[in-house]
C-alpha cells in the first residue's frame, strides 16, 4: 500500500506557507534534510531542542483517473501521453532517425526535419548507436547543439546492443551497456539520455547483469529511464521480476514493430504487461518501411528506402508474394482514407495511435514535407470510430484474437 506522511499541526506552524512539506527538506549538501555539511534534519529555527514532529502514516489516495490521459499542446495540437505508467510525458508522435539521419538525407535536411518536428510539438527523438555506424547520433547531437533548445523540453532515447566489431562492443554485458552508452553520449554531446533501450535481448548475458547495469547507468545520471526493444513479453516480465527481487530499477517501456500487417505483440501481449507492471509501448514501422503508402505499386522507386544500398532485404520484402498481397490490401484501404479526407499513410499512423498502451509512434521521414503530412494523422485519430476500425479489420482480415 502506498503511504504519505501527514505532518502535525505544531510542526506545520514552524514553517511558512510556501514551505509546508511533509518531512524535513534536504539542505544543499545534506543527505538527511539537515543543513549543508550534515545535521539531523531539524526544522529551521528549531535548534533541535523543541518538540519533535510526529508523523503518521495515512493511506495515499489512488491517482485520479485523468492522470494518464492525453493532453493537447497549446498552439501545436500535439497530444502527449505518459510513457507507460511512468511520470514522463511524451508526444504521441516521435521522430526516429533510422536510415535517414547520417545516411539517406543530408545534414541540412535532417535539421529541417528536426526543426519542423520540434515546432509542431514533437518532443521525443529516437536514435541508436548502430544507426549509420554512429553517424545518426552525431548528426542529431550537432543539430541539438546548434539549436540551443532547452534540454528539459525534449526527450532523447538511444539503443544499445550493436556498437562495434569487437566481441566486447556488442551485446548487453555490463561492460558494453556502460561503455556503449558513454559512447552514445559523446556522439550526442549530451550529459544524459532520457531513455536507454536494450536493442534486443541477449541470451548470452544473465538477466540480473542486464538489470543491474541499467540500474547503474541510471544511478550515475547517464540515463533517466530504461526500456527494451524487440524483447518478448516473458523476457520483459523476467527483467521486471528481477528488478523487484533485488530492489533495482525495472524497464518502463518496450519498443516494438507495429503496423497494419504486424499486430499480435502490440495488440495482444503488451497491453497485459501495461496493466500488470506498467510497461508502455513505443512503436515503430507504422508504414512498414513505406509499404503502406501506395508509392511502391508493384515497383521500387529510386527515392525510397528499398533502393538504398544495403537494404536489399527490404526490396526483396516489397517484391515478395506477401509484399504484393499487402500492397493490394493497401489499395483496398484507399476508399476508407478518401472517406475520411486523408492519405493512406495518415490513416495507418492514426490507426497505430489508437492501440491500448501505446505511448508514442515513431515516424521515419526523409523530408520536412513528408513529416508535416504524417503529423496530419492527429486529425484523423478523432475520426476513427469503432465502425471505421471494424471496417479496416474486415478489409485486412488479420485481427488477432485472444487465446482465452
Curated annotation (Swiss-Prot):
Protein name: Voltage-gated potassium channel subunit beta-3
EC number(s) from the headed UniProt entry: 1.1.1.-
Protein location: Cytoplasm
Tissues of expression: Brain specific. Most prominent expression in cerebellum. Weaker signals detected in cortex, occipital lobe, frontal lobe and temporal lobe. Not detected in spinal cord, heart, lung, liver, kidney, pancreas, placenta and skeletal muscle.
Record key words, sorted: Cytoplasm, Ion channel, Ion transport, NADP, Oxidoreductase, Potassium, Potassium transport, Transport, Voltage-gated channel
Pfam families: Aldo_ket_red
GO cellular component: cytoplasm; plasma membrane; voltage-gated potassium channel complex
Polar residues composition bias: residue spans: 1-14
Annotated binding of NADP(+), by residue: 97-98, 104, 126, 199, 229-230, 255, 284, 286-289, 295, 305, 364, 366, 370, 373
UniProt-listed CDD domains: AKR_KCAB3B_AKR6A9-like
Species whose genome carries this gene: Homo sapiens
Function according to Swiss-Prot or TrEMBL: Regulatory subunit of the voltage-gated potassium (Kv) channels composed of pore-forming and potassium-conducting alpha subunits and of regulatory beta subunit. The beta-3/KCNAB3 subunit may mediate closure of potassium channels. Increases inactivation of Kv1.5/KCNA5 alpha subunit-containing channels. May display nicotinamide adenine dinucleotide phosphate (NADPH)-dependent aldoketoreductase activity. The binding of oxidized and reduced NADP(H) cofactors may be required for the regulation of potassium channel activity.
Catalytic residues, chain numbering: 131
Biased composition regions of type Gly residues, renumbered to the chain: 28-50
Chief location of this protein within or outside the cell: cytoplasm
An example molecular function term from Gene Ontology annotations: transmembrane transporter binding
Amino acid at each position: 500500500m502506498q503511504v504519505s506522511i501527514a505532518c502535525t499541526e505544531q510542526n506545520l506552524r514552524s514553517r511558512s506557507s510556501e514551505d509546508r512539506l511533509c518531512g524535513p527538506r534536504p539542505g544543499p549538501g545534506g543527505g538527511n534534510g539537515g543543513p549543508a555539511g550534515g545535521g539531523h534534519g531539524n526544522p529551521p529555527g528549531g535548534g533541535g531542542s523543541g518538540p519533535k514532529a510526529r508523523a503518521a502514516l495515512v493511506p495515499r489516495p489512488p491517482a485520479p483517473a485523468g492522470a494518464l490521459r492525453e493532453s493537447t499542446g497549446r498552439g501545436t495540437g500535439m497530444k502527449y501521453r505518459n510513457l507507460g505508467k511512468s511520470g514522463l510525458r511524451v508526444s504521441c508522435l516521435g521522430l526516429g532517425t533510422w536510415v535517414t539521419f547520417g545516411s539517406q538525407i543530408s545534414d541540412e535536411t535532417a535539421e529541417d526535419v528536426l526543426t519542423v518536428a520540434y515546432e509542431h510539438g514533437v518532443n521525443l527523438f529516437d536514435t541508436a548507436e548502430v544507426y549509420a555506424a554512429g553517424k545518426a547520433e552525431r548528426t542529431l547531437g550537432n543539430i541539438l547543439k546548434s539549436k540551443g533548445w532547452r534540454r528539459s523540453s525534449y526527450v532523447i532515447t538511444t539503443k544499445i546492443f550493436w556498437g562495434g566489431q569487437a566481441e566486447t562492443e556488442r551485446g548487453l554485458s555490463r561492460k558494453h551497456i556502460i561503455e556503449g552508452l558513454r559512447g552514445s553520449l559523446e556522439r550526442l554531446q549530451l550529459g544524459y539520455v532520457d531513455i536507454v533501450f536494450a536493442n534486443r535481448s541477449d541470451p548470452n548475458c544473465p538477466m540480473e547483469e542486464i538489470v543491474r547495469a541499467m540500474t547503474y547507468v541510471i544511478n550515475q545520471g547517464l540515463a533517466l529511464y530504461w526500456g527494451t526493444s524487440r524483447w518478448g513479453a516473458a523476457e520483459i516480465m523476467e527483467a521486471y521480476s528481477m528488478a523487484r527481487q533485488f530492489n533495482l530499477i525495472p524497464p518502463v517501456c518496450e519498443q516494438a514493430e507495429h503496423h497494419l500487417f504486424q499486430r499480435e505483440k502490440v495488440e495482444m501481449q503488451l497491453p497485459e504487461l501495461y496493466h500488470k507492471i506498467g510497461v508502455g509501448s513505443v512503436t515503430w514501422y507504422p508504414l512498414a518501411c513505406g509499404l503502406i503508402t501506395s508509392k511502391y505499386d508493384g515497383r521500387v522507386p529510386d527515392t525510397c528506402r528499398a533502393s538504398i544500398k544495403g537494404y536489399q532485404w527490404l526490396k526483396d520484402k516489397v517484391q515478395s508474394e506477401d509484399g504484393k498481397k499487402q500492397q493490394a490490401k493497401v489499395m483496398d484501404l484507399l476508399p476508407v482514407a478518401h472517406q475520411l479526407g486523408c492519405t493512406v499513410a495518415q490513416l495507418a499512423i492514426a490507426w497505430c495511435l489508437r492501440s491500448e498502451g501505446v505511448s508514442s509512434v515513431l515516424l521515419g521521414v526523409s523530408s520536412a514535407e513528408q513529416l508535416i503530412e504524417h503529423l496530419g494523422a492527429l486529425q484523423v485519430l478523432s475520426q476513427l470510430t469503432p465502425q471505421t476500425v471494424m471496417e479496416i479489420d474486415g478489409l485486412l482480415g488479420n485481427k488477432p484474437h485472444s487465446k482465452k
